[in-house]
């Protein structure tokens, strides 16, 4: 009887805690803050200063994405900074860890580890994805660190984009902005440094690193970074708050102001999950300029909640004057890019959703270059050709290579 009594009270306690966790996860972030325009003011101030000498290359395919990361790590002589949302112990994840182990061990820290007394903080994710070598070169974008995004370890892969930036490391450079941002995240009081004994897996990592060098020795040799990149007019980092808390949508506000600079906007995002404020912003943009969204069709997406929300909100989105390319290409689109006019390209981790705007840490890189903008617009053509274009006037057009896919439940 005593044992049953204890189990009963344990069940009640567990149920009460789960209810507490669910309710706080819903209601703590519910009051949504407003942007004050601070991030936009910082961005405008940077434009008034002399631009640093920085060069850029876009990284479009998974094999190149893994190889450039390995090359960047191999080139480091002093320091490597690595921040990622989703690192797995699969093929590409082990490749990265082997390369990092081969370069240096500089400490590992978890952003906002689990706090059982404040379970709502699980809502706030470190969604940044970047890798910096020696304070002079970095890769930043939307790719996570696993086989869905890197290498050729599995057949099914996501479509995504990174940019490689080579910098002079000057005071106003984007790499200095990124390092400052990293330090602000690294120093958050909630973070936890992981310590412990040397893992028994270090020998395996050393062997894997040796194998990587044997296979990719030529590619991992000294890289002519200038030849591999193109000069651009200006590069600047936009970042949200590093705190693990509900955030003012400063980054979204800055992106909207940026989009207002052009008359032809292509917004690439895996899904669209907005509140009225965000939809109103899109509507205001679409009133005086062409605004088109390139996103996954319901039958193409890998995010069930994103797809279901788009089904529910599709007519609302179209009524705002936005045209939507619904991609059906056999691979889930994970790209987060905004192409503005003929000279601005914005690439990073920010999805067009409330989580990116109000909860998670996010980074977007603003690149001023007609050459880069033209190249990224050309890259998008293959997905536009495989899309169904839902027009805001109620019409529908089909790309030259669009193929209808029947959903299994229809």
Predicted regions and their residues:
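Charged, low-complexity intrinsically disordered terminal segments
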Residues: 2-128, 133-410
